[in-house]
């Protein structure tokens, strides 16, 4: 079992601050990070994955420090985000051949298998891909170097409902391989069936919830949405 520990990690921009954040994740479990746009979800994931520098604190993966050993740390993290840029004028296969060997556990065979399972055509140049296809490619690449943790920023947005179910089935298989998954997403009934833990971002503050709180949170979200609909109807129609 692997552990990803976030210890007082913080980040400040001109008009936003991610408050010092601490939590611990274990491999084999899916944690969902929810919250409104601009609440700090992407900021936390970018810092935790090593893509963006952070102001204070540290993250450790099985004792490997992001602050002190960033290359070794990032070698064990798979990161997926539509903000990531690969060689956009090249195909997924070319990107795999060029970038994959920089990871110590890269497997081109696993890359092929994952792309086939996700119904992804690897020959097109990346700039030609839709958002959903680009997220498929990134997920395959991230998993092909056999990370201990997979960090994903809103991976479901570009998927149609049919593929979304298939994608979550693949994620369940990844969890069964003892990989930890940390996903930012708007909570849905589909994610409810797979999520083990829930984190919530609100104006730069991150709160952690136990599994038994997930049902109550989702119920409250549904009630809130229904009340918003009723209010909108009463004001406009």
PLM feature spans:
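Conserved beta-strand
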Residues: 6-9, 16-29, 57
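The feature captures the beta-strand-to-loop junction immediately N-terminal to the Walker
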Residues: 34-36
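Helix-to-loop junction immediately C-terminal to a conserved catalytic motif
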Residues: 49
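Conserved ABC transporter NBD signature motif
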Residues: 57-68, 72-73
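ABC-family P-loop ATPase nucleotide-binding domains
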Residues: 81-137
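Catalytic Walker B motif of ABC-type/P-loop ATPase nucleotide-binding domains
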Residues: 150-154, 159
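H-loop/switch region of ABC-family ATPase nucleotide-binding domains
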Residues: 184-186
């Amino acid at each position: 079992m692997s552990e990803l520990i976030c210890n007082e990690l913080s980040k400040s921009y001109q008009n936003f601050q991610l408050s010092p954040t601490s939590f611990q994740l274990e491999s084999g479990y899916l944690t969902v990070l929810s919250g409104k746009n601009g609440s700090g979800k992407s900021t936390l994931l970018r810092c935790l994955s090593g893509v963006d520098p952070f102001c204070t604190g540290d993250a450790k993966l099985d004792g490997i420090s992001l602050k002190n050993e960033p290359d070794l740390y990032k070698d064990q993290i798979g990161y997926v985000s539509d903000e990531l840029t690969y060689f956009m004028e090249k195909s997924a296969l070319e990107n795999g051949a060029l970038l994959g060997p920089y990871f110590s556990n890269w497997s081109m065979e696993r890359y092929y298998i994952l792309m086939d399972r996700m119904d992804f055509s690897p020959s097109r140049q990346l700039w030609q891909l839709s958002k959903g296809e680009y997220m498929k490619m990134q997920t395959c690449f991230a998993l092909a170097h056999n990370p201990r943790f997979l960090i994903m920023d809103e991976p479901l947005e570009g998927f149609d409902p049919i593929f979304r179910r298939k994608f979550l089935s693949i994620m369940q298989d990844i969890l069964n391989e003892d990989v930890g998954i940390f996903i930012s997403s708007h909570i849905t009934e589909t994610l409810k069936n797979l999520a083990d833990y829930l984190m919530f971002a609100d104006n730069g503050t991150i709160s952690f919830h136990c599994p038994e709180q997930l049902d109550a949170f989702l119920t409250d979200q549904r009630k809130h949405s229904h009340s918003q609909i009723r209010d909108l109807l009463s004001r406009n129609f």
